[in-house]
Amino acid sequence: IREFYKMYRPAPLVRAYCLEKKLGTPAKIYYKFEGNNTSGSHKLNSAIAQAYYAKKQGLKGVTTETGAGQWGTALSMACSYFDLDCNVYMRTYGAKVTPSPSETTNVGRKILKEHPGTSGSLGCAISEAVEVAVSTEGYRYVLGSVLSQVLLHQTVIGLETKIALDKYGITPDIIIGCAGGGSNIGGLISPFAGEMLRGEKDYQIIAVEPASCPSLTRGVYAYDFCDTGMVCPLSKMYTLGCDFIPSANHAGGLRYHGMSSIVSELYDQGLIEARSVEQTEVFKAAETFAR
């Protein structure tokens, strides 16, 4: 796994000089760029680890879901590297793709019957991918976010960030990350949250989530299923309900009803803040950043 990481890690930590100038702020703004690998996102950090252990276990292949396609792309790459089959359930294209919800699974047919014309959700796709995995010999289901092992794989993001900042004597005041299922924000804040839990330092950590799927800001902290079909084990998290179908938006990877147990616990303890943002606001900010 570490040998594979060497192909694209460490990922660059970049200072946003032009953004600072545009905003007219005295603050120094840095961003961790995880798009420097072939898959284009941080998802490869966990995909390669899970594919490695799947191959070591002697499996034929894996099934999964993906929202925007980042996880599906990353897992497809990792499976190709280890010569594993990869079956992805999503709303658009990827490895071997099955539009979700689909007519190929019991869960998919049930959802389509109850909600004709639905745009689906990550929860729906998870249920379908799990159903195929448990009914196909030599296959297992793997998840690209939410679960604790995925966040542990993603801690490489935060560890690299802290090493780089420490090297130049920089202590961040505010740490911000987008939050869908929790792998991105969880990986980024891991070493900083650890310092806070040990009482060593204090940071302002902000998780930013979509207003159309605001699990932290409008959800309840309870045990809930990780999927719509109620096949997966219960997990304690901030959730909008496993049957919640979010409205369609342009951030497919953020259309998930719940939040990682680790991130949820940190939020419940008051160590991190959460804010929900409309996608139109995000587009405007992205345009400013790009310019």
Where are the predicted features?
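Positively charged, low-complexity intrinsically disordered leader regions
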Residues: I1-L59
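Active-site nucleophile and cofactor-binding loops and adjacent substrate-binding regions
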Residues: F33-S46, V62-G72, L147, I176-G181, ...
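Flexible loop/turn segments at secondary-structure boundaries
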Residues: T38-S39, Q70-T73, T105-V107, Q149-L152, ...
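A short, small-residue-rich loop immediately preceding and capping a beta-strand
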Residues: S46, Q57-V88, T171-I185, I205
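A glycine- and small-aliphatic-rich helix-loop capping segment at beta-alpha/alpha-beta transitions
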Residues: A49-Y53, A78-Y89, S190-K201, Y223-T228
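Active-site-proximal loop->helix
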Residues: T63, W71-S119, L216-F225
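Active-site/ligand-binding loops adjacent to catalytic centers
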Residues: K110-Q149, I157, G169, G194-E200, ...
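Phosphate/pyrophosphate-binding loops at sites that engage ATP/ADP/AMP, CoA/4′-phosphopantetheine
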Residues: I163-I170
